[in-house]
């Protein structure tokens, strides 16, 4: 037995097409061709039989057509004048070209590729011009081991003609009527009983055809249209239907090393190396025959593949999903789709154990481990592991959106985005969470949601170690470290690090408040504000301080509160260096330096430096007192006044003077007291220059100059500048002792 001594290379399994042949393939078939070629190349790389990337693969991955022009240039000058003479000779001999006829070029090419994949098991060698076979012999062409074949003139014409359709023979010129020396002898690994087996079968007027470099023999009758394909490997017989089928498959990694056949049909026990062979075999059970053999009982080897190809060309959908009703033109596409419903993921990554429902998805995943990104964007230099990802990315620069929604006309850069968008109109939510039953219209949303149950946060910041459940959140967070603010407001020029923050900011200019409370009707520009507001009505306070146990209805309030315990004051005033724990406090403080009072009361025209001060002041006019003491029921217009009042009931005095030990119930009282020790008098009268340590004393003194007497006696209507003076005066009417 002659063994194949050299390692299989990509050239051995590559199949190229001419312009004419590619014109017969629709988009689905062209995609299938590309996938098969790329899969063969990756399998060779994985087993170490290919150390470089051929130009053909690079061109296929970039979906370019330059390679077709090159092949046309290489072969065009040899196939012009010769074709007419060869076709005349072939028709005279009663032969037909099956490359573009009943047997499609696609089926022949795939069969050639599958046979080349197994060429490591036997060596094919052709030499010489003389043969022991007559032009017409009386037996099926089952060639035995060690037999020589001489190709006659008609045979040579056919061989040369087949060479025009097959791109396996590249850059070789074969004159009409001649066969290269490398073809003249064929050594096949079969039994030595060839002559006996040929003589025992009574089939007349058969002519042998052989394809270059491949041990495939087809017998075409002068009187019938039967197509019988002979090959070195014996035809596999189906026990249920009795028909013979061919294994037509690309090179796979498993079949090279183990010979394992993992794809088995439901109708019979026949097993195959790949799914495409299984799909072709299943057509036999469906009773599909080649048009060339429609008048006979016997099926041809390729008959199962022809109806599938015809349905793809015509766009007819013959296979339907019982789960969702989606239609497909090929049963293989239906089976792949059904894994969406069953959850089956037969393709597993050996590096990380992740599984996929399609082999193409596994190949796309593998570069994640290698880190290889050979495809670079010419515009921004960004790298990608797949050419398809690069093509999709390029649409960001070109603005191309080729996928349009027929309902609303919205455009998308990716088909998957369009499909997900269409579910908005249909309301379809096919993806269901197994833990809580929640349904989603997009699989990515389901995967993201599942991290809520698993608490998985796979995306980690290299700078601070913070983890995120979404890659998008990580990218947004990283801008905190880089200071990048790619989103600019055209109105005010303000920059933002995230698109969501930018969109929320734009509502400041537009005044849009899309989030409205159903209870009180109040509107909000951001959903987070709206959700926090709703807790005012529900009383929910889900955020708890771990130090003191205090609860808050908003996470931001909790973060601000925690700085009370840590003493952190990240917001510094550039004028005086004073620190603040909250940004709002810093903004309020800065008005002290600028003197700005942008908030104006519409009732009395009084102005304030802070919005909170304006809101507190407006309650003077409305009489609103929303802050009520739970102990005595007394109400106050300001929260700070309520907090001071509550100390009366508790007797608590948490603020202590370190100089004299005196305690105070309010921090302002402690601050005013400390000026007794320091002698500080920050409040100075501009009229007389007198200084005061407390603001209340300063305000009282100013009434001396203004003549204001706001405290009026209810009995005699006499006015006083100080409350204490009024209280002293009232004793005159009550008869109290001085």
Curated annotation (Swiss-Prot):
Keywords: DNA-binding, Metal-binding, Nucleus, Repeat, Transcription, Transcription regulation, Zinc, Zinc-finger. One of its GO terms (molecular function) is DNA-binding transcription factor activity. Transmembrane segments: none annotated. It is found in: Nucleus. InterPro entries: Ikaros_C2H2-ZF (IPR050589), KRAB (IPR001909), KRAB_dom_sf (IPR036051), Znf_C2H2_sf (IPR036236), Znf_C2H2_type (IPR013087). GO terms for cellular component: nucleus. Residues 8-79 form the KRAB domain. A zinc finger (C2H2-type) spans 263-285, 319-341, 347-369, 375-397, 403-425, 431-453, 459-481, 487-509, 515-537, 543-565, 571-593, 599-621, 627-649, 655-677, 683-705, 711-733. The keyword Lipid metabolism does not apply. Belongs to the krueppel C2H2-type zinc-finger protein family. May be involved in transcriptional regulation. This is Zinc finger protein 235. It comes from Homo sapiens (Human). The lineage of its organism: Eukaryota, Metazoa, Chordata, Craniata, Vertebrata.
